[in-house]
């Protein structure tokens, strides 16, 4: 995608998604989805453009309740019609790596569903917990 095409179509990163925001990840996914929805030609090229130290993170705290809630919100932002189906497919496909003794598949799916619905009603994980 060319920069001028992005500007012409007024595609921007979502301010609610990404490190330091209400929903801790997914800004890149939503950005690319928006480019495709606008009909822009998106391609990938397998070049290494950066090296990132993955040993510590200021926002990723593991596969905890917020992770699954935010994952549901991401899929809610991606698609009203197919978002929940896609979310369930991703959770099922990655069930061996995402779930552990602390959070079961069933619990993670329930949290993701809450995030999916919560996003539609502007309820973040923090607001949800404040109301409980």
PLM feature segments, named:
Residues 62-132:
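Non-catalytic, C-terminal membrane-associated alpha-helical segments of glycosyltransferases
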Residues 16-30:
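Acidic donor-binding loop at a coil-to-helix junction in glycosyltransferase catalytic cores
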Residues 13-15, 39-51, 63-64:
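Catalytic beta-strand/loop signature of glycosyltransferases that borders the donor
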Residues 54-55:
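Short Asp/Glu-rich motifs
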Residues 34-36:
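Hydrophobic residues within well-ordered alpha-helices
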Residues 58-60:
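Intrinsically disordered, low-complexity segments enriched in Gly and acidic/Ser/Thr residues
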Residues 1-12:
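Conserved nucleotide-sugar donor-binding
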């Amino acid at each position: 995608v060319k920069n001028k095409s992005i500007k012409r179509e007024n595609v921007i990163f979502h301010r609610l998604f990404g490190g330091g925001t209400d929903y801790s990840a997914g800004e890149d996914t939503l950005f690319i989805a928006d480019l495709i929805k606008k009909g822009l030609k998106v391609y990938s090229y397998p070049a290494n453009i950066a090296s990132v130290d993955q040993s510590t993170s200021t926002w990723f705290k593991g596969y905890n309740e917020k992770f699954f809630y935010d994952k549901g919100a991401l899929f809610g932002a991606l698609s009203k019609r197919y978002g929940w189906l896609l979310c369930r497919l991703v959770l099922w496909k990655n069930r061996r790596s995402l779930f552990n003794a602390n959070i079961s598949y069933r619990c993670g799916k329930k949290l993701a569903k809450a995030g999916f619905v919560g996003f539609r009603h502007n309820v973040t994980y923090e607001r949800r917990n404040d109301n409980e």
